Design a protein with these regions (language model features):
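Short, acidic/small-residue loops that bind anionic groups at enzyme active sites
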Residues: 11-34, 116-135
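Short, glycine-/small-residue-rich phosphate/pyrophosphate-handling segment
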Residues: 31-69, 82-83, 138-171
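Extended, histidine- and acidic-residue-enriched regions that form the cofactor-binding/catalytic faces
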Residues: 95-102, 106-125, 137-150, 158-171
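Beta-alpha junction/loop-to-helix N-cap segments that form part of ligand/metal-binding clefts
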Residues: 1-14, 107-111
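Glycine-rich beta-alpha junction loops
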Residues: 43-46, 68-73, 109, 130-133
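Short glycine-/acidic-enriched loop or helix-start segments at secondary-structure transitions
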Residues: 8-10, 49-51, 113-116
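Active-site rim beta-loop-alpha module in soluble metabolic enzymes
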Residues: 51-108, 113
């Protein structure tokens, strides 16, 4: 899983069951438990893509800012990297400077930070992985599937030609 929800629309075209992105889940849940939130992600290069998703998901009214901690995802696993402190410091800035009421952790690698940060800062800190899993569980329990009318319709079968003709799927 990646917080930029890469391939989400393509996945919805391939399966009938519900498909939920981790950014999508996190920002929607954040908007349900707070009036405003900031996203704290890893690297600055991720910020434009996440700002685009905020717009795509209609959350621009709720999202105060997308912030980068400049912590590469693999540094999150290294206790000596200082990465966790940088993320904690960025969360503190988001709460004071952005005046956000909740924090969305903008990387799947931050999943294990949510509880501690929420307890420390006394605000909801949402991780997208857990959020997406719980939303999918809820959608399944409600008996809901991805609509196959128009936008997320299954792709039409294509006839293979030339050297790939023998690889044509049967059915």
């Amino acid at each position: 899983a990646c917080f930029d929800d890469t391939g989400l629309d393509a996945a919805r075209c391939q399966v009938a069951g519900p498909v939920v992105g981790i950014c999508e889940a996190a920002v929607h849940i954040a908007s349900m438990v707070s009036n405003s939130f900031s996203i704290v992600t890893t690297l600055n290069r991720s910020v434009p893509a996440l700002e685009g998703l905020v717009l795509k998901y209609g959350m621009e009214r709720h999202c105060r800012r997308v912030r980068a901690s400049e912590v590469p995802v693999l540094d999150l696993e290294d206790a000596n990297s200082g990465g966790r402190k940088k993320i904690r410091d960025e969360v503190a800035k988001a709460l004071s400077e952005d005046r956000s009421e909740a924090i969305v952790l903008g990387c799947a690698g931050m999943v294990d930070l949510a509880r501690d940060l929420s307890e420390e800062f006394q605000v909801p800190v949402i991780d997208g992985v857990t959020s997406a899993v719980k939303l999918v569980e809820s959608l399944v329990s409600l008996g809901l599937q991805t609509s196959k009318r128009n936008g997320y319709a299954f792709p039409r079968a294509k006839t293979y030609l030339g050297r790939f003709q023998s690889d044509q799927p049967s059915g």
